[in-house]
Design a protein with these regions (language model features):
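An N-cap/entry alpha-helix motif that binds or orients negatively charged groups
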Residues: 10-57, 118-126, 130
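Conserved alpha/beta-domain cores
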Residues: 64, 72-75, 85, 126-253
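N-terminal amphipathic alpha-helix/helix-capping segment at the start of soluble metabolic enzymes
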Residues: 4-5, 46-70, 132-145
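Short, conserved acidic/polar surface loops in the N-terminal third of protein domains
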Residues: 80-84, 102-109, 160-163
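A gly/proline- and charged-residue-enriched helix-loop-helix capping module
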Residues: 95-145
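Active-site cofactor/substrate anionic-group-binding motifs, chiefly glycine-
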Residues: 63-64, 69, 73, 80-100
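Short, Lys/Arg-enriched, disordered terminal segments
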Residues: 1-9
Length: 254
């Protein structure tokens, strides 16, 4: 057993060293494909952490088995969320998903800062689009053990005044399958997206979303929590206004 553990540690170190040769986005994609290969070979248990404290928590009727999950942006196309849950993560947020497929910003768009052990991305909502993402969710959800969040956002070419239509169509697609929906209005990498966080635009958008949710609750007999992604760069005054607008429209959290 000790030999196996040492071998796994050696392979992990070798893999990390090798991946640093590649551009950051390529390394990320290789890592995800390797993870899927390990999962398909039924070897994922060798890499699953047994050290995650199982402190259950309930948020808006979402039952989390622990406090560690995967934020939106890693599994953009809902291809790996079931694998992350098998590693011990309590929730996975897929996306951000747009109505139609889009390629995102030009490469390079993920940048390494090795000294700080950080990555900065400016991907720009690259994804395969709502139809394919929904198919992926239906395909892999039976293998998933956790809370599934779906982050939705407006398409790059959608004008701010029409953005509400994108979000409502995306709610039609994903409301039933999601354990929660995240309304992404905070990404700095999508042109004009943050215009939606102005008080006037946000109030209009969230009013439409709130009305749509009432319809979907009646249709599916299911109350899917809706959270809003706010930018960390907002001023305190703007943040207070945005929270007030969200509470007024029965948004569940941030």
């Amino acid at each position: 057993m000790r030999l196996i553990i040492k071998l796994i540690k050696f392979l992990e170190d070798l893999t990390l060293l090798t991946l640093r040769i590649f551009p950051a986005e390529t390394a990320k994609n290789i890592t995800l494909r390797l993870l899927k290969l390990i999962y398909n070979l039924n070897l994922i248990s060798l890499f699953a952490s047994g050290n995650i404290k199982k402190s259950k928590i309930n948020i808006k009727n979402l039952s989390l088995k622990n406090r560690i999950g995967i934020a939106g942006g890693l599994d953009k196309n809902a291809e790996y969320f079931h694998i992350f849950s098998s590693l011990g993560f309590s929730f996975v947020e897929v996306g951000t998903v747009t109505l139609e497929p889009q390629t995102g910003n030009p490469k390079p768009r993920i940048f390494r800062f090795t000294k700080d052990k950080t990555l900065v991305n400016s991907l720009g909502f690259n994804n395969v689009g709502s139809v394919q993402v929904l198919n992926n969710i239906k395909k892999y959800k039976p293998k998933f053990d956790g809370v599934l969040g779906i982050s939705i956002g407006k398409s790059k070419n959608t004008k701010t005044k029409n953005a509400w239509q994108d979000y409502l169509h995306l709610m039609d697609y994903f409301y039933f399958e999601a354990d929660y929906l995240a309304i992404n209005i905070s990404s700095p990498n999508t042109e004009n997206l943050r215009e939606l966080s102005s008080q006037e635009n946000l109030e209009f958008l969230l009013e439409k979303i709130s009305q749509k949710k009432v319809q979907l609750i009646d249709m599916y007999k299911k109350n899917t929590p809706i959270f809003v992604k706010l930018s960390p760069d907002e001023t305190e005054e703007n943040l207070k206004n945005l929270i007030e607008v969200s509470e007024k429209n029965s948004i569940d959290g941030f």
